[in-house]
Amino acid sequence: MAHKKAGGSTRNGRDSNPKYLGVKRFGGQFVNAGEIIVRQRGTRFHPGPGVGCGRDHTLYALVEGLVQFTTKGEKNRKYVTILPEQREEAAS
């Protein structure tokens, strides 16, 4: 004979891992080709010149230069572009 009452199962008790979404490089920052600029779900930001879009809508730099965020078009879409500029090397 059981001396403990059977415990009921619960439907809660799990959590998903964090996805670390968001802007990784901000306007005016220098980026190298291949650096991730924005991790997002869907196209919250659209790729402009010098920016590529990955399979999961991640925006990344195709060229090195300065990041610029702009809003344009009828729908006021946010675009990320790269202004190709040579980085000033620090004299050391």
Swiss-Prot record:
Gene Ontology terms describing biological process: translation
Family: Belongs to the bacterial ribosomal protein bL27 family.
Protein source organism: Legionella pneumophila subsp. pneumophila (strain Philadelphia 1 / ATCC 33152 / DSM 7513)
Protein name: Large ribosomal subunit protein bL27
Keywords assigned: Ribonucleoprotein, Ribosomal protein
Any one GO MF annotation of this record: structural constituent of ribosome
Gene: rpmA
Region of interest: Disordered: 1-20
Transmembrane annotation, as ranges: none
Any single Pfam family the record assigns to this protein: Ribosomal_L27
Any one Gene Ontology cellular component term annotated for this protein: cytosolic large ribosomal subunit
